[in-house]
UniProtKB/Swiss-Prot annotation:
This is Serpin B5. GO terms for cellular component: cornified envelope; cytoplasm; extracellular space; sarcoplasm. Gene3D superfamilies: Alpha-1-antitrypsin, domain 1, Antithrombin, subunit I, domain 2. The lineage of its organism: Eukaryota, Metazoa, Chordata, Craniata, Vertebrata. It comes from Rattus norvegicus. Belongs to the serpin family. Ov-serpin subfamily. CDD domains: serpinB5_maspin. GO terms for biological process: extracellular matrix organization; morphogenesis of an epithelium; prostate gland morphogenesis; regulation of epithelial cell proliferation. Glycans are attached at N99, N133, N188, N298, N361. The gene is Serpinb5. Keywords: Glycoprotein, Secreted. It comes from the Eukaryota.
């Protein structure tokens, strides 16, 4: 479990850095656990360089039995939909002309239940597109309509990866709605945009990351199954969003150091956090190629002979759509009466860009990773 967590974190960080290069000042959001689960399913049917590249990019070198490693995380996170509005949908759609081998079907059945679907891209393209769109819409309770953009599939599509993930959090401690005020959010040194700023005074786990002049806070969601970790620069110091130093120094090792519970302690905090919603449709293909997935998308070099005897099979497209919404909503915040008096309070005022992680606490896996740069 630990090896898989480290692998997932390393992949998350590397893909995040790729996405930041593409959009230095934009909001970023993706679900690393969705992508790595889907790619690990594709790896079961891959051989040779294709299988090796997936293993390297996803950092599976030290992970024993990858497919069953994902199963407890996936089933655990799926159970959380009774506490939160949370869905992680991962699908591999395969054209029926591939005649999947019985070995591939049986080896993926248990660890990837419901994640593999055979469809007809070749002869019933429009019908298949409609089926995928309506299926994802239903699975995400209507959050995502028409997940497949124009020209995302063709009658030549053999393998399609579709991820759809959304989360509307409910906090352990509710933010009082009467305290939410419009405030300026500094998107850089000179410009601001108005934002609805939520305010709460309570005890949270707080830490300082001196190397990058940042603070980090852990905000638990209801029942503490998930937490949001926010890394906030003490000020906007660069000419961009103020996150350049974090993005430069971020790697799998530094992320582990920054989020290590031993570097944080409980403190009384005066917290200000914007209400926000980030919805992203990312096309991770180019980023995954940059990380080393060279043959996966290339018909002339990909090898999916572990899945089918058909030659020239590659992954045609990866659709990754995610949405995260943060509001005041949460449980009743019970603070001890009188405990506020005469106590020093730390301030955590997220009125400028920050990096955030939504973590599954039991397995410490990253469910969502992103940055909020602008309302």
């Amino acid at each position: 479990m630990d090896a898989l967590r480290l692998a997932n974190s390393a992949f998350a960080v590397e893909l995040f850095k790729q996405l930041c290069e593409k959009e230095p000042a934009g909001n970023i959001l993706f679900s690393p656990i969705c992508l790595s689960t889907s790619l690990s399913l594709a790896q079961v049917g891959a051989k040779g360089d294709t299988a090796n590249e997936i293993g390297q990019v996803l950092h599976f070198e030290n992970v024993k039995d990858v497919p069953f490693g994902f199963k407890p995380i996936t089933s655990d996170v799926n159970k959380l939909s009774s506490f939160y509005s949370l869905k992680l949908i991962k699908r591999l759609y395969i054209d029926k002309s591939l005649n999947l081998s019985t070995e591939f079907i049986s080896s993926t059945k248990r660890p990837y239940a419901n994640e593999l679907e055979t469809v007809d891209f070749k002869d019933k393209l429009e019908e298949t597109k409609g089926q995928i769109n309506s299926s994802i819409k239903e699975l995400t309770d209507g959050h995502f309509e028409d997940i497949l953009p124009e020209n995302s599939i063709s009658d030549q599509t053999k393998i399609l990866v579709v991820n759809a993930a959304y989360f509307v959090g409910k906090w352990m401690k509710k933010f009082p709605e009467s305290e939410t005020k419009e405030c300026p959010f500094r998107i850089n040194k000179t410009d601001t945009k108005p934002v609805q700023m939520m305010n709460l005074e309570a005890t949270f786990c707080l830490g300082n990351i001196d190397d990058i002049n940042c603070k980090i806070i852990e905000l638990p969601f209801q029942n503490k199954h998930l937490s949001m970790l926010i890394v906030l620069p003490k000020d906007v110091e660069d000419e961009s969003t103020g996150l350049e130093k974090i993005e430069k120094q971020l790697n799998p090792e530094t992320l582990l150091q920054w989020t290590n519970p031993s570097t944080m302690a409980n403190a009384k905090v005066k917290l200000s956090l914007p209400k926000f919603k980030v919805e992203k449709m990312i096309d991770p293909k180019a980023s995954l190629e940059s990380l080393g997935l060279k043959s996966l998308f290339n018909e002339s070099t990909s090898d999916f002979s572990g899945m089918s005897e058909t030659k020239g099979v590659s992954v045609s497209n990866v659709i990754h759509r995610v949405c995260l919404e943060i509001t005041e909503d949460g449980g009743d915040s019970i603070e001890v009466p009188g405990s506020r008096i005469l106590q020093h309070k730390d301030e955590f005022k997220a009125d400028h860009p920050f990096l955030f992680i939504v973590r599954h606490n039991k397995t410490r896996n990253i469910v969502f990773l992103g940055k909020f740069s602008s309302p």
